[in-house]
Amino acid sequence: MTAATLVTLALSLSLAQHDAAPAPVAAPVEQHGQAPEAAPDAHGSPAGEPGAAVEAHAAAAEHGEAAGHEGGHDESLGAVMLHHVTDGYVIEHPGLCHGGLAWNCEWDLRETFGDSLKFGKLDMTPTKHVVMMWLASALLLVVVLGAVRKKSLVPRGLYNFIELLVAFVRNEIAVKNMGEKDADRFTPYLVTAFFFILFLNLFGLLPFSATATANLSVTVAMALFTFVITQYAAIRAMGMGGYLAHLTGGVPKSLAPLWLIMIPVEFLGLFTKPFALTVRLFANMLAGHFVILALLGLIFALGTPWVAFGSVPMALSIFLLELFVAFVQAYIFTMLSSLFIGAGLVHHGDDHGHAEEHGHAGPAAGSEHGSHVAGASPGHG
């Protein structure tokens, strides 16, 4: 039996149960010789009027919505998936609640902070993704300070792994994209971005946690940091005049009318880089969680436990893949940030390279010419 058939049968059963609901009791037939009249409904509207059915459906919908709010969350598959990937003010955790030890306790951040962080229309109340970023920042400080205070010449265990990652970011990412001279200036930012994104990605795989990097606002903020540092590096390397001249796309002054086309194109190109960083990290982290939730949701959508024998192993394999993706996405964001920063430095380096090349060409040519003359003298002699 195919999945489509199972879904069709489930829908048919639910519709049949809905149609089999007891109908309202009809008004009594003629009594004492009077003509039958429709009994008034609960809202005081005669049942024979067309508006009665509309009012009844509206009241039922209102009652269902209120019950949904009182009962907690919508239990549909789509609502559950969105609940686990979107941001909010409620953090679920195990603990003592509901009269005992429970797994579905809730910490409402709005009740904790109240109106203390509201300034007019600006609401600074932290959400669960903000809490995850606080935890990632605290863990980053603990790991870095612990690695710095380690006095042994040969670090072991976790600190050996941390030192390996730091050396990898510097030598394989920063140095190769910026050069030895400029790498040390921007390595602290690249290392911070790498570990911060890595911790946020790993937090999203823990129970009762949330994936902050699957929030578009978080990835936009991270990309803006890279954007600002990239523009700072370019202006520092080329100067404001060289930076503005670079927006012409290398078109000479003799073709100045083409600047009307090149300057807008180059200006928009400045923002395509942070846009790529934003969408790449956001989409990759969001997609993995959606796939896991969809595979597990098949058990409840199809209404049979036998689906678990296929969906659970598949979800577990995707979960293990997400562990790898957590490192890969942190690496890609750091690599692209290094490339974009290095792109602002390369023009400055090229100018120096050409100057040095032309500066050394004269003496080299002179010495080469002198050697030819010296070598030819004995022959002529």
Curated annotation (Swiss-Prot):
Keywords: ATP synthesis, Cell inner membrane, Cell membrane, CF(0), Hydrogen ion transport, Ion transport, Membrane, Transmembrane, Transmembrane helix, Transport. It is found in: Cell inner membrane. PROSITE patterns: ATPASE_A. GO terms for cellular component: plasma membrane; proton-transporting ATP synthase complex. Pfam families: ATP-synt_A. It is a multi-pass membrane protein. F-type ATPases have 2 components, CF(1) - the catalytic core - and CF(0) - the membrane proton channel. CF(1) has five subunits: alpha(3), beta(3), gamma(1), delta(1), epsilon(1). CF(0) has three main subunits: a(1), b(2) and c(9-12). The alpha and beta chains form an alternating ring which encloses part of the gamma chain. CF(1) is attached to CF(0) by a central stalk formed by the gamma and epsilon chains, while a peripheral stalk is formed by the delta and b chains. Key component of the proton channel; it plays a direct role in the translocation of protons across the membrane. Belongs to the ATPase A chain family. This is ATP synthase subunit a. It comes from Anaeromyxobacter dehalogenans (strain 2CP-C). The lineage of its organism: Bacteria, Pseudomonadati, Myxococcota, Myxococcia, Myxococcales.
